[in-house]
């Protein structure tokens, strides 16, 4: 009988077999730790209120028809001041 060579496939299946508990349940092996950290970091960044404000202001800017730079600046500043006041009040 030939002995099975260690291929990436057999190594990965051996690794899974080692992780089985006594009851036959397989423990979940986390994905690559860096991918988990990156996802956590991404979620923290995107959940910030500042990100939401940026999205809102970009949508407002895109919705304007032929804005001049001055009218755009005035409109955005007014909105920013209003939202800042609301944050201080609440």
Curated annotation (Swiss-Prot):
Family matches, as Pfam families: PB1-F2 (PF11986)
Keyword Membrane attached: yes
Stretch list, region Disordered: 1-34
Keywords: Apoptosis, Host cytoplasm, Host membrane, Host mitochondrion, Host mitochondrion inner membrane, Host nucleus, Host-virus interaction, Inhibition of host innate immune response by virus, Inhibition of host MAVS by virus, Inhibition of host RLR pathway by virus, Membrane, Modulation of host cell apoptosis by virus, Viral immunoevasion
Site (Low pathogenicity) residue list: 66
Stretch list, region Mitochondrial targeting sequence: 65-87
Compositional bias annotation for Polar residues: 1-16
Domain of life according to the entry: Viruses
Signal peptide: none
Example of a GO cellular component annotation carried by this entry: membrane
Subcellular location: Host mitochondrion inner membrane; Host nucleus; Host cytoplasm, Host cytosol
GO terms under biological process: symbiont-mediated perturbation of host apoptosis; symbiont-mediated suppression of host cytoplasmic pattern recognition receptor signaling pathway via inhibition of MAVS activity
Family the entry assigns: Belongs to the influenza viruses PB1-F2 family.
Subunit description: Oligomer. Interacts with human SLC25A6/ANT3 and VDAC1. Interacts with host MAVS.
Remarks, miscellaneous: Is not encoded in all strains, and seems to be dispensable for replication.
Function (record text): Plays an important role in promoting lung pathology in both primary viral infection and secondary bacterial infection. Promotes alteration of mitochondrial morphology, dissipation of mitochondrial membrane potential, and cell death. Alternatively, inhibits the production of interferon in the infected cell at the level of host mitochondrial antiviral signaling MAVS. Its level of expression differs greatly depending on which cell type is infected, in a manner that is independent of the levels of expression of other viral proteins. Monocytic cells are more affected than epithelial cells.
The name this protein goes by in its record: Protein PB1-F2
Species of origin: Influenza A virus (strain A/Hong Kong/156/1997 H5N1 genotype Gs/Gd)
Lineage: Viruses, Riboviria, Orthornavirae, Negarnaviricota, Polyploviricotina
């Amino acid at each position: 009988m030939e002995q099975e060579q260690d291929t990436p496939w057999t190594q990965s299946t051996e690794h899974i077999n080692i992780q089985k508990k006594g009851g036959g349940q397989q423990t979940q092996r986390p994905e690559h730790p860096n991918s988990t950290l990156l996802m956590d970091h991404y979620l923290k960044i995107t959940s910030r209120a500042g990100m939401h404000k940026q999205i809102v202001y970009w949508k407002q800017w895109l919705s304007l028809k032929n804005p001049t730079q001055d009218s755009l600046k005035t409109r955005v500043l007014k909105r920013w001041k209003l939202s800042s006041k609301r944050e201080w009040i609440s």
